[in-house]
């Protein structure tokens, strides 16, 4: 039993080849919606955190600011809910740069690394099953263990 009419291969190909929307239409900010503002300090901080050169020209800073604003407009569109009144400031929370997230940590030394390795325990939440032996692996239907020749 068919719910809809059957389509031939050429009809399906034509249907899929015909664009129904364009991403460029989503990159332009609709009228009446506030464009997220990004200042130069945010751009420099993002570049520094990303490990990129943060001493760039004004033109490059302007280009990056415009690109980030365009991305935020697009992401705002992705999070739009047609059934609920749109609150334009809600998505700005996703782009906060919190100082605590990017604090420089104290470098680990060999002793600290060895201690953390020795205290590791398998986590069932992560799907870790603990220690295993070659005998257990050979009997498991999901693994094939072959001896080296």
Curated annotation (Swiss-Prot):
This protein's UniProt keywords: ATP-binding, Ligase, Membrane, Mitochondrion, Mitochondrion inner membrane, Nucleotide-binding, Protein biosynthesis
InterPro entries on file: GatF (IPR027499)
Catalytic activity, as annotated: L-glutamyl-tRNA(Gln) + L-glutamine + ATP + H2O = L-glutaminyl-tRNA(Gln) + L-glutamate + ADP + phosphate + H(+)
GO cellular component: glutamyl-tRNA(Gln) amidotransferase complex; mitochondrial inner membrane
A Pfam family: GatF
EC number: 6.3.5.-
Family membership noted in the UniProt record: Belongs to the GatF family.
Main function: Allows the formation of correctly charged Gln-tRNA(Gln) through the transamidation of misacylated Glu-tRNA(Gln) in the mitochondria. The reaction takes place in the presence of glutamine and ATP through an activated gamma-phospho-Glu-tRNA(Gln). Required for proper protein synthesis within the mitochondrion.
Name of the featured protein: Glutamyl-tRNA(Gln) amidotransferase subunit F, mitochondrial
Species for this entry: Meyerozyma guilliermondii (strain ATCC 6260 / CBS 566 / DSM 6381 / JCM 1539 / NBRC 10279 / NRRL Y-324)
């Amino acid at each position: 039993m068919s719910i809809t009419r059957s389509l031939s291969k050429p009809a399906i190909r034509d249907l899929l080849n015909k664009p129904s929307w364009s991403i460029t239409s989503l990159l332009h900010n609709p009228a009446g919606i506030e464009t997220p503002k990004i200042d130069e300090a945010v751009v420099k901080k993002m570049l520094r955190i990303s490990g990129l050169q943060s001493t760039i020209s004004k033109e490059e800073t302007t280009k990056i600011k415009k690109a980030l604003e365009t991305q935020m407009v697009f992401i705002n569109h992705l999070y739009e809910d047609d059934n609920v009144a749109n609150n334009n400031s809600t998505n700005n929370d996703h782009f906060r740069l919190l100082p605590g997230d990017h604090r420089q940590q104290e470098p680990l030394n060999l002793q600290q690394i060895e201690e953390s390795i020795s205290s590791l325990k398998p986590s069932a939440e992560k799907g870790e099953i603990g220690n295993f032996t070659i005998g257990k692996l050979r009997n498991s239907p999901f693994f094939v263990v072959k001896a080296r020749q």
